[in-house]
Amino acid sequence: MLFQLNIVFKELKNPDFFFFFFFFSLPLSSFKLNLSSSSSFKLWLIVFLLDFGEIMFPAPPLPIANFSGALLPLSLFLGFLDVDLIAAKALPLEVTTNRLSSFALIVSSSSILPPRISSSSFPPLLATFFLLKKMFPAPPLPTTIGALLFGDEVVACKD
């Protein structure tokens, strides 16, 4: 029996949590992917480095007005996602600069999960990840973290 993954986000402000959870849980869950521990770690490491790179060097948001029209073909392209979008009974969804308006995204595994993910599946996975990261750019780092990472001067607040 396939592992059922049902995630509901309302007022999604930081979709990085979803992508981290989904990609990280793929090799560790009961999905019948037949991934070896080596390839599982490589997949997780690639996604982690991509996400860290997006935080360090964020890409500008893409002007996408129809979220459902963009995501559903991607799910069909990947071939193993069953995606339903609910947005206050109104589609298409309006995408603002750094966030989406109120909506719920329900992702569940379907019966068309492939029995195995081979190395040929990595390019579409990575391409989809990049596109989704551009659609939902990560929020900017807090000033103190940015100062620690980039060596800017940190001004301490006095009590």
From Swiss-Prot:
The note filed under miscellaneous reads: Partially overlaps YDL173W.
Q: Does the keyword Lipid biosynthesis apply?
A: no
Transmembrane as a keyword?
yes
Chief location category: membrane
Please list every transmembrane segment annotated in the UniProt record, as residue ranges: 17-37, 44-64, 67-87
Q: What is the protein named?
A: Putative uncharacterized protein YDL172C
Name a single GO cellular component. Answer: membrane
Q: Where is the protein found, in the record's own terms?
A: Membrane
Keyword vocabulary terms for this entry: Membrane, Transmembrane, Transmembrane helix
* Protein's membrane topology: Multi-pass membrane protein
